[in-house]
Amino acid sequence: DLSAASLIIGVKQIPAEKIMNNKNYLFFSHTIKAQPQNMPLLDTILDKKARLFDYENITAGGKDGSPRLVAFGKYAGIAGMIDCFQGFGQKLLADGYSNPFMNIPVAYMYQDLDQAKSTIQSVGNMITKNGFTKELGPLVFTFTGSGNVTKGSREVFEWLPHQYITVKELHTLKADIANGTKPSNVVYGVLTTAEDMVAHKDGSAMTDKNHYYANPSEYVPIYHKNVIPYTTVLVNGFY
């Protein structure tokens, strides 16, 4: 019961039906760009005479267009990737596979980042020593985005023995491991961009994002064919 609270603090937007009269709210409302799906929320805030403090509007010097001071950053990616490893280990265990990721606790259980890094690097030593069976490998972590969240998630990923490969190399990875041209005792990372997600209808590559954004009907999706079938874990770092 938050009826006695004068300030209600959240992270993501609060459902419109939860907004109370004459309250102060602090959260990401996703309304500053006039996102149509969230206009009912803004209308409700006005109707109920509530006051909204939006993290997105907290900027350097309090000026429009100045750098934001509150945003999802590197540590969101770090914590998310640690929990990703832990959840992945539990998923493999549920599928009947003993695996080194089971030895990674969730992010909140570490005293500090150094402890998390040491734990994950020790798991990496197990991977280097034992590798993965044919049933499990290759393990491919596919990343989207290039911002702070992705940078944080990649930092944690790189605590393990790893190699980055291209989307094209994905298609031959199993064969390359089988013939010894690529190792089986690492995890693989793939960095994907908008160019990997769509192509022109004639099959030619998308090379101009602005043209794609302006003319989406001239393009077809390719990510589901070229990337997803070869991906073990999709690490989504863009909004």
List each model region and its residues.
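Short secondary-structure boundary/hinge segments and terminal tails
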Residues: 4, 62-64, 175
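Rossmann-fold NAD(P) dinucleotide-binding segment
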Residues: 4-33, 221-233, 239
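Glycine/serine-rich phosphate-binding loop and adjoining beta1-alpha1 elements at the start
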Residues: 16, 20-139
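Glycine- and other small-residue-rich loops at beta-strand/loop junctions that grip anionic moieties
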Residues: 30, 69, 73, 142, ...
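Glycine-rich phosphate/diphosphate-binding loop of Rossmann-like nucleotide-binding domains
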Residues: 96-232
